[in-house]
């Protein structure tokens, strides 16, 4: 996202999503002009991060929701370590299998970001990690079923 796009989008959106690469500066307790501009909007901000944001000065800021993410297309399940997932509000999926977001949900993630495609045969950057509508429906069904487990 570009800083000038914030002004363009602001009247039409309820929240902004910051990709992992653009959010890294916050983990060093610094921020970019893009982050500052988005925070100034006072809208909810969702930020993907591979590293726990727990020690970030913005960690408890009500306006920000944090998603755990491995910034790789595709991400192999063996690369996922959900050990710190509870430091995050959710999970941004880059795995081609539905098991990763399902597990994140079962571990308490309140926000799940998945990529969706209309056509798996197309060649897009994220199409190899995108779910078609049938897979998305299966994922949602499994999540709803898992919510019936006693806690």
Regions found by a protein language model. Name each.
Residues 1-151:
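Catalytic cores and adjacent flexible loops of soluble metabolic enzymes
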């Amino acid at each position: 996202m570009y800083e000038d796009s914030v002004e363009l989008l602001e009247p039409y959106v309820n929240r902004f999503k910051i990709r992992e690469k653009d959010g890294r500066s916050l983990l060093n307790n610094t921020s970019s002009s893009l982050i500052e501009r988005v925070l100034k909007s006072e809208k909810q901000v969702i930020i993907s991060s591979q590293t726990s944001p727990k020690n970030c000065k913005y960690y408890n800021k009500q306006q920000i929701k944090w998603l755990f993410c491995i910034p790789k297309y595709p991400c192999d399940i063996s690369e996922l370590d959900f050990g710190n997932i509870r430091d995050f509000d959710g999970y941004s999926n880059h795995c081609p299998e539905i098991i990763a977001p399902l597990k994140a949900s079962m571990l308490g993630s309140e926000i799940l970001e998945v990529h969706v495609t209309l056509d798996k045969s197309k060649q897009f950057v994220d199409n190899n990690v995108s779910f078609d509508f049938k897979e998305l429906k299966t994922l949602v069904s499994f999540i709803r079923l898992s919510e019936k487990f006693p806690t």
